[in-house]
Amino acid sequence: MSGAIGPIIGQNYGAGHFDRVRRAYIDGLIYVLVYVLVVWTILFFIRDMLVDAFSATGEGAELVRLFCAVIAGSFVFVGTLFVSNAAFNTLGYPFISTVFNWGRATLGTVPFVWFGSLWLGVPGVLWGQAAGSILFGAAAAIVGYRLVTHLHRRPPGEPPVPIWRIALSPFSTGKSLTGI
């Protein structure tokens, strides 16, 4: 999904169809929601079959059941993050994409998993991972929605103001690094 939504957003942005950019972003989020709900529903109903298929017992069986019944739903927010990052990258905001990706992978994972494990043991690891994904996915969706609803203020052709400049080595234009 994240590889497919970027070109659609980019083409409509380049053509100045800001309403279509917003619609593509929202449709991408809806697609992620529906897809995860379908898979989550399937996992919910086959969770005991999966436990049997993996010959899981005890705590392992309970973890599989927890994931299939509850935690799998948090992947809506992982997908939301992917769609939002594709939009950020396509619209010229790769730094925002990087912040959200790095944030979820570090700040949205390590402390949540650590505290989750302290409070709930092994299931807390899954709960912590889900909590971090929900936090960063929801934040990315909010920022992404605000971005696509305010595109008309910055027409195509005007690149966003860079947050920093990459130091260029001698004999280099830096185009391979920045794409500019």
Predicted regions and their residues:
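Hydrophobic alpha-helical interface/terminus motif in multipass membrane transporters
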Residues: 9, 50-51, 88, 115-116, ...
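Transmembrane-helix signature of multi-pass solute transporters
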Residues: 29, 34-42, 107-112, 135-142
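Residue-level recognition of transmembrane alpha-helices
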Residues: 32, 68-71, 75, 101-102, ...
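Alpha-helical transmembrane segments of multi-pass membrane proteins
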Residues: 58-84
